Structure formats: structure tokens, C-alpha cells
Amino acid sequence: MANSGLWELITIGSAVRNVAKSYLKAEASSITAKQLYDASKITSSKRSTSDLHVQLLEKYRNGKVKHASQIKELGLSSKDTKRTLLGNSLDVQKDASGVKHLQEQSSKEIKNPISQPILPNKKDEISPAKPSAIDSSIKDVTKSHPATNANFTADFESSIEESYSTENKSPVILSSSKVPSSQWSRLWHYGGLATSLSVGAIGEKMKRMWGISKDDGALLLNERNVEILVNKLTQMRGAALKMGQMLSFQDSKLIDPRVSQILERVRDGAHSMPEKQLEQVMVKNLGKNWMTHYSEFDRKPMAAASIGQVHRARLASNHMEVVVKVQYPGVMSSIDSDLNNLAYLLKASRILPKGLFLENSLAAARKELKWECDYEREAAFAERFGSLLKNDSDFKVPMVFREASGPSVITLEYLHGIALGKQKYSQATRNHIGYLLTKQCLREISEYHFMQTDPNWSNFLYNGKTKKIELLDFGASIEYDEKFIKKYCRLLLAAAHRNREKCKKLSVELGYLNNHESAQMIDAHINSIFTLAEPFAFDAPDVYDFGDQTITARVKQQIPVMLDLRLQPPPEETYSLHRRLSGHFLLCAKLGAKVRCKELFSGMLKHYAD
């Protein structure tokens, strides 16, 4: 049966199921305008009907309800309490209060698991700790891959800045749900999602006709559908959630605000898998006696992201504190089908702007996702970085424990540093950190020819005792062709010397331009490169103040022109390379670092000069 036929079958089946559920929930037999509107409310699970449930959940997640006595004061039974606390956002929302709560919840940030201390447990198991943010190794919140680029610097977009919050916020309570692991089950979920969104759009249209809704936005992106889409993507995990996280780093001005809202929330949330599935993954990778590798293992994850979750543990062999990344079952095998189904939804909805080259973005995402799902590949890159920085006085890379790792499980050394932005530093320390990060970024491009391309700054810890920067998450590491790197470095040098003709020539050789673009497009492209190279320019100040930089804002001004006028997508390398570069600039800006960029740049790239 053709894929389109499967979509039709699943869509029809889901429509019958959802409409029937809505019809049975009607409280009166007569059909009124309000009931027609209610019939379009499709939910993935039962909703709480009590204001007390909403009140309890909000208080619980804010840390105000901790004991049974407090719960009883709210007048709820233990059954009600369990249902309320374990329910997801849709379960307890009222049209207004639920949206408000979800928005508050999506903005929360939690500590990096690799920087959390491990506490021994009398029962030979690590005591459950408050959930903390996934180390950047799986923060795929963390992983922040833009799916598309406007042109040379289309990754410099405002939403990246929003992911680098420096506030210490309350921990998020992870919801647990089974990961749909087979292709058929995932296809069924996508079909149900498509139907729910369609019925929701019809319902929204009827509400507007009857004057019930004052919303004037896109029908498909009504408030109800936003909740459905966020809930489904966080439940599905895998490529669906990953793609949402990638798209979340596109400029919010170029995408419908409600799409941006959806993407921001799926970037910051995911469900953890039940313990039964955790056991299955561990057995598959390390054997039935997998627990013999650990003297302690916390079965409750510290955090969950798009392709896996993180657990704290201690090795049995040497009692070292470690973190264990466990991949969701079926994520690797479902990448192709997930992205195909997601592309179907994106094309059908027409919610993405012209110029994003969806097919190219999906192709890049497909390749990178498969790399990131290969934990053995990640282990190899971690060891490679570790070897290069083994004797470095400024950087540390976690050890990989191969005996406790597999294709979808990786055990890494626990690091004691704190994620950048989690604490305040003196100006001198911020300058030092900015200098080291700039040096490492340029070193990866010009010397290593491979980079860790995840821009999330939770991947960079600072250890106040050792004064070292600790590097995490090598799943997004990519090696670049030497010919590409040579021309790319020459392009950066030309931009630093403000040579427009040479920039244009090298841009054509690299594939950013094809000599048929309009003068307006060429100017926008070259101006964006000049802006990118500003900290390294020959006429730049010796010490560049990132705290005052406006690079991001000025490059953003060129993006609409490039999206509208470009004739071809940028080189494939751009998607990952500029993700790292843009992330580095924003990281230094958040630190407010003052760095001798020009000196570093000229010294490290001088052998690429003509």
C-alpha cells in the first residue's frame, strides 16, 4: 500500500475515533453553535474537570505541595492526586489557565546533570535527585540544530539567544510515557495528529463564524491545536521532537509567532520513557546482567530530551561517578519515516516561509540525526577530542567507559564543573573564558578540521577549582573536507580585510552564490560576512567587547533579503558549521567577555593567507 494510502486510512480512522469521542462528551442532545465548537476539541487523554486539580498541579510543580497533609487540605483523594500529578499539561488545562501554566513550564531551566553531585544510597542505589537539565550531550534543548540557513549566516537568529537563559529556575517534573517504537505505531500517531489538527481547524472556523473566538490568526494554529501539537511531539520524541528543536532556532520574525511558540516549547520539553523500556534498552546494549557494571544506578532520569535521557550512576569497577545516556527505543530506525511524515505535515500546512529549502534542511537533519543516534560514533569523537586535549592546561574532556557503553547507551565520566551561565564570574574570569572558547572554536576549524557543532552552552562547564573548561556532548561532532575548510578560512580572512571582490569570488567557489544573483542579494550576503568577521577585522579594536556587540541583530537584518532572493541553498557544511559559530558569538555575548579576537584570529589562520 502506498504511503499516501496509509495516511488516508489512518487519517480517516483517527477522524472517526476523535469525532466519536467528542460527540459522546456533549452534555446536551441539541446541537448549538457552542456544542459544534466543543466537538472540535480533540484531546490525547482525559481532562481534569476540577479547578482543584489545576491548583494542585501548579502548586506541586512550584514546590509548594510536598506532603500528604498539604494535599488533603486541598480536598483531593489519593486517586485524584495521582491522576493530577502524573497527568500531562493537556490533562489539567482549562482553556486559559492551562496555556498560562504550560508557558511558565516551558520557560524553566534546570541544572546540567554532569555538574550535579552524586549522593550514596543505603540501598546501594543512587538517591533520586531533583530533575536537572540534560547535559548538553543530549540536550538536543538543548540540542539546538537549525534545520535551515538563510545564507552564509542565517543561523544568527534571535531565538538562539533565548535558549541561553542564565537564570536559576525551578526544576521541571518529567512526565513518563511509552515511546512509540515501531514504524506503524509512529505512523498511526502522525495520522492521529494530522486529523486532530484538521478537526481543530474546522472547529476554530466555526467558533469564529459564531463569534465565540476573536482569534484572527491561522486556523490551523489556533490555541487548541498548539497544545495538541506540543503534546504529541514531546510524546513522540525522536526525529519529530528533534526537528522541532532544530526549527526553533529559526528567526521568530520569519515564522508565524504561534509556530515559534510551538517550537520553543518542544525544544524545552520531552517525556521520559517508562522503566520497562529503560530495562529493555539496557539489556539490549549491555546484556541481562547490565547492573553488574554499576554499583549504583538511579533509574529515575535526571533529564529527557529528543533522542534519549540521562541517568546518574557509579561504576562497580572503580566506583567513579558517571552519567549514563540511554537512547529511546526505535529512534534510530524511525528517523527516515519520521522526517518524511513531518515533511508531509509541514508542506500540507504551508507554515514555513519561502526560501528555507525544506528538502535540503531535512536531508541535513536526516544525516546529522543518524550520526547523533550512533553513540559508538559519539564515543569515538569524545576519545578523539580527549586525545587532542589530554595535556591541555585549559580544557578537559570526559572519559568514555566502553565496557559500559553500546550503540544506544554511553557511560561518561562525571564532571564537576558548572554550566556557563549558572553562576556569576568576575570580569577577568569572563574574559579568560571567552578567550579560551574563541581559541578552541578557531582551533577546531583551522587545525582539527572537525567541530563539536552543538551551540548549547550547557556543553561548556567551568570548573572553579581547576580553572578548566570542561567540554561535553560530542554526538554532534562533524569532520569537514580539507578543501572546504581551506576556502572557508580564506573567505573569513577576506572578510576580515574587507575585500568584497575576494569574498564574492570565494563565495561562488564554495557554493553560497552562483553568479546569477541580483546585486541586492550579493550585497546582503557580503555584508553579512563582513559583520560576522567584525571581531577579527584588521580595523577592529585590539580587545573586542562582546557585551556591546550588535552582530546578531545586524546579520538578522540581511536574512529576509537572502531568504527572498537567494537562488540556491548554502553548502551542506553550513548547517552545522554556522550553528557552532553563531552559538559561540552568542555565548561570548552572554558572558559579556572582552577578548583579544584579532590577535587570536590572525595567528591561527595566517597559514591560510594567500
From Swiss-Prot:
Residue spans with biased composition (Basic and acidic residues)? 98-111
Q: Which Pfam families match?
A: ABC1 (PF03109)
Signal peptide position in this chain?
none
Alphabetized, the UniProt keywords read: ATP-binding, Chaperone, Kinase, Mitochondrion, Nucleotide-binding, Transferase, Transit peptide
This protein's pathway reads: Cofactor biosynthesis; ubiquinone biosynthesis
What GO biological process, any one, is recorded here?
A: ubiquinone biosynthetic process
Reply yes or no: does the keyword Transmembrane apply.
no
User: One GO molecular function term?
Assistant: kinase activity
- Presence of the UniProt keyword tRNA processing in the record: no
Q: What is its main location?
A: mitochondrion
Catalytic class of the enzyme: transferase
Catalytic activity, EC: 2.7.-.-
Compartmental location: Mitochondrion
Which Gene Ontology terms of cellular component type are present? extrinsic component of mitochondrial inner membrane; mitochondrion
Top-level taxon: Eukaryota
Region: Disordered, residue numbers? 98-144
What does the similarity note say?
Belongs to the protein kinase superfamily. ADCK protein kinase family.
Q: What does this protein do?
A: Atypical kinase involved in the biosynthesis of coenzyme Q, also named ubiquinone, an essential lipid-soluble electron transporter for aerobic cellular respiration. Its substrate specificity is still unclear: may act as a protein kinase that mediates phosphorylation of coq3. According to other reports, acts as a small molecule kinase, possibly a lipid kinase that phosphorylates a prenyl lipid in the ubiquinone biosynthesis pathway, as suggested by its ability to bind coenzyme Q lipid intermediates.
Please identify the protein, giving its name as recorded.
Atypical kinase COQ8, mitochondrial
> Origin organism of this chain?
Schizosaccharomyces pombe (strain 972 / ATCC 24843) (Fission yeast)
